[in-house]
Amino acid sequence: MVEQGDAAPLLRWAEGPAVSVPQDPALQAGGWVRGGSGGGRVAAEAPRRREPEEPAPPEVLLQPGRLELGDVEEDQVVAVFVVTFDPRSGNMVEWCLPQDIDLEGVEFKSMASGSHKVQSDFIYFRKGPFFGLACFANMPVESELERGARMKSVGILSPSYTLLYRYMHFLENQVRHQLEMPGHYSHLAAFYEDKKGVLHAGPGRGGSLPPVYWLPSIHRYMYPEMKITHPAGCMSQFIKFFGEQILILWKFALLRKRILIFSPPPVGVVCYRVYCCCCLANVSLPGIGGTIPESKPFFYVNVADIESLEVEVSYVACTTEKIFEEKRELYDVYVDNQNVKTHHDHLQPLLKLNSADREKYRRLNEQRQMLLYSQEVEGDYSPCEEDLFVLFFLEQNNRIFQTLLEVSASQDKTLTAEHARGMGLDPQGDRSFLMDLLEAYGIDVMLVIDNPCCP
């Protein structure tokens, strides 16, 4: 199997059998799963054509306030745009539909700082209540006016980032078309007319979107919109890149801290790290998370986002702008390549790996190796490695919160070292993490694990 680079196509549509829709989420044994399905890069091959007698697989993505049970989430492209770099004026929106939509700042979000150093890239970002995907390309030209390079991005906005990846291949083709034939927008206009969505006023139409919920069925439907086609997969790349430190990121993600990931361009693969980081915090137990902010993937951010980030209490984002490192009031955790750090004294203990963390990482790799062996020997690719990754942390999180809820419902509400070990935590090394977790989620228990540093 030939190994591919990070820029290889990652995601394509995953079709599956029908999933029955429950009448009441309370009737589901597993409860609801607060999900983070990510966008992704569409594979270059043409999509499989469905035969006439073959039923279309139903969507199972639900968003409270927008869709009813059993509804299908339709395409809702609310804007399409072309951004160009002008040597005299800088980044600017060259063309868009509809013409009256507010695209302020999109010219910087869709063309990341430092993009002139790469030939192509793709960028996920957030614009108010919408999510965006833009494909960037840089083409050498023999033009003194353009200083030897023509740079453009073609992108779209949608209320849901889980739908954006469907149009990756189209956007890649269109940005090349715009570079070679500037000013020809007929294909983009036809695309918008075909895909434009009608948005209705209602809950979640303000400055932030409602949380995304998934039907708790077979494991693969925790992200029904995606299927990894890359030989390594974005989850595998995430594990390989961060190694044992994914357990540090897991704790910060579960605590809903503000996590900012820095990396120079290309930024597309870093947007996937944002998504993977959000996947670490999935919980499917009812009653969990009502008092804590949702895990928000902001994807790419730049200096134009500083004002909006100042009011956020929880997010995961990435940037190519090093100046963010100096603005400590904007983040709790700063990730520079594989270096995870925090300036908050009370969070410093969470940066240290303990024996329980290493054991979890060992088990994760052991399960991955067993899965890969099964795939190679038996040819069984269901479940895939990405299913395993999501389920591993989902089950770990459920085990922790199930124990905490049981202790909080008991008469003495006492959480002991034995409870901590049963949750897969280190009684001493994870004491600070447990205290922060109890406070963040408002769980009423008494922690009686002694602190060895304090007599």
Swiss-Prot record:
Source organism of this protein record: Rattus norvegicus (Rat)
Q: Which GO terms describe its molecular function?
A: guanyl-nucleotide exchange factor activity
**One GO cellular component from the entry?**
cytoplasm
Which ranges carry the cDENN domain?
Answer: 214-362
Please indicate which superkingdom the organism of origin belongs to: Eukaryota
- Keywords from the named record: Acetylation, Guanine-nucleotide releasing factor, Methylation
Q: Which InterPro entries match?
A: DENND11/AVL9_GEFs (IPR051731), LCHN/Anr2 (IPR018626), Tripartite_DENN (IPR037516)
Composition-biased stretches, type Gly residues, lie in 32-41
Q: Identify residues that carry Omega-N-methylarginine.
A: 41
Q: What does this protein do?
A: Probable guanine nucleotide exchange factor (GEF). May promote the exchange of GDP to GTP, converting inactive GDP-bound small GTPases into their active GTP-bound form. May play a role in neuritogenesis, as well as in neuronal recovery and/or restructuring in the hippocampus following transient cerebral ischemia.
Region named Disordered: 21-61
User: Family, per the entry?
Assistant: Belongs to the DENND11 family.
Boundaries of every uDENN domain copy: 15-187
The induction annotation reads: By transient cerebral ischemia.
Protein name in the entry: DENN domain-containing protein 11
The free-text tissue note of the record is: Expressed within the somatodendritic compartment of neurons, is also present on dendritic growth cones, but is not found in astrocytes.
Q: Which residues does this entry mark as bearing N-acetylvaline?
A: 2
What are the dDENN domain coordinates in residue numbering? 364-455
